[in-house]
């Protein structure tokens, strides 16, 4: 069984809630998902819901409340206790910080410092029995500061690509089928910059599969 462990920030929920829902509902017996929800994530989503009337944030909070549903058999969710942040020293974060990085970690606002604390806790301090945790974020600044502190991070698209393959997702199967058809009907060549390209005959054009339905017309 393959296991994936993700720390999820607010931007991942707000911009990729549909993807996260699909991961949970499509999770097969061959894949186990562990989600860690930091205090930062809950506070940010609550702020976006209350102050900016974000529909995505509101739906994300509702979804998080339902994640302990028994129908998500291969999913484990860990909601961070705020008290955890009090036991993590800032020096623990700075120990992993690359001082040559672009971001002055010491001058970050407290909420971002708390996110770093949560990530350092899961990645390095907690007894994880060999588990490797990855931060999912759609915020370039957060991914940059995570990289500077040696915290593995990725985007929704990155995770989607990996999980679609492991869960044998329909979109992955169709994409793989399309790629195989391209290889069959084309010729592999190498471009001037060293990239591999597939050259096809116009008369053997292959179109990617589309969903069923009627073509809309005005």
Curated annotation (Swiss-Prot):
Major site of localization recorded for this protein: cytoplasm
Biological-process GO terms, alphabetical: nuclear-transcribed mRNA catabolic process, nonsense-mediated decay
Keywords assigned by UniProt, alphabetized: Cytoplasm, Nonsense-mediated mRNA decay
Location of this chain's protein in the cell: Cytoplasm
InterPro entries given in the database record: PIN_dom
One cellular component (GO) term of this entry: nucleus
Top-rank taxon: Eukaryota
CDD domains, per database record: PIN_ScNmd4p-like (cd18717)
Further comment found in the protein's record: Present with 6090 molecules/cell in log phase SD medium.
Function recorded in the entry: Involved in nonsense-mediated decay of mRNAs containing premature stop codons.
Name of protein: Nonsense-mediated decay protein 4
Species assigned in the record: Saccharomyces cerevisiae (strain ATCC 204508 / S288c)
């Amino acid at each position: 069984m393959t296991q994936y462990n993700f720390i999820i920030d607010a931007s991942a929920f707000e911009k990729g809630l549909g993807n996260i829902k699909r991961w949970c509902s499509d999770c097969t017996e061959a894949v186990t998902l562990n989600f860690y929800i930091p205090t930062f994530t809950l506070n940010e989503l609550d702020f976006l819901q209350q102050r900016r009337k974000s529909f995505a944030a509101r739906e994300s909070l509702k979804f998080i409340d339902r994640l302990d549903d028994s129908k998500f058999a291969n999913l484990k969710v860990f909601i961070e206790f705020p008290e955890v942040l009090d036991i993590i020293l800032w020096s623990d974060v700075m120990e992993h910080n690359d001082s040559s990085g672009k971001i002055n970690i010491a001058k970050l606002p407290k909420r971002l410092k708390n996110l770093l604390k949560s990530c350092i806790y899961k990645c390095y301090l907690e007894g994880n029995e060999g588990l490797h945790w990855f931060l999912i974020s759609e915020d370039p600044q957060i991914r940059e500061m995570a990289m500077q502190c040696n915290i593995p991070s990725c985007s929704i698209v990155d995770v989607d690509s990996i999980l679609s393959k492991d869960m044998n997702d329909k979109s992955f199967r169709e994409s793989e089928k399309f790629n195989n058809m391209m290889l069959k009907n084309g010729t592999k060549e190498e471009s001037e910059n060293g990239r591999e390209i597939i050259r096809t005959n116009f008369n053997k054009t292959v179109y990617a599969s589309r969903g069923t339905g009627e073509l809309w017309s005005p």
